[in-house]
Amino acid sequence: MEGSSAGQNDFLEPGEWAAWTALLMLHRTVLQDLDAELRREHGLAVTEYNVLSTLSNAPGKQLGMSALAHRAMLSPAGTTHLVTRLERDGLVKRSVDPADRRKWFTALTEKGDKALQAARRTHSRVLQRSFLAVTSPADRRLLRQLWQRLSQASPGAG
């Protein structure tokens, strides 16, 4: 990465380090592009979009808070803070789990579903421009296979 010292990658070959930093830079760039356009066009941060999308794909469009945090790849505290903002804006609603009153569910509201549908067009457009337009179907198959292997090899996989 920019400004990295030689000591930061003493255990990696230059090509290994370059591959790693290229992946990080691509990820950061695409997320920044998504975040900027989602905020400008829909008033949603990319993390908010991700939570709405995660809820939309869940059974009954609702999840417990810990499941939502896990699936959205957020910390529990970050999820609580984000859900509070989304609830204030009427995009989600929280309710107590009737089976265990210590737990909470978060559900996508109709307003949240409409906001998500509108934002999905922007999300798709950015991904088309920054990823799909510059990769072939064969490239994407290869990347998908590679990412699956990397995910399975990760200690936190599963």
Can you describe what each PLM-predicted range is?
Residues 2-7, 84-141:
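Charged, amphipathic alpha-helical coiled-coil/dimerization segments
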Residues 24, 28, 53-57, 120:
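Short, locally clustered residues in the helix-turn-helix/winged-helix DNA-binding domain
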Residues 32-75:
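N-terminal helix-turn-helix DNA-binding core of bacterial DNA-binding proteins
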Residues 65, 83-84:
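Short, hydrophobic-biased segments on the C-terminal half of alpha helices
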Residues 1-14, 137-158:
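C-terminal regulatory/oligomerization modules of transcriptional regulators
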Residues 15, 47-49, 111, 139:
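N-terminal positioning helix adjacent to the helix-turn-helix/winged-helix DNA-binding module
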Residues 1-42, 89:
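N-terminal leader segment of winged-helix/HTH proteins
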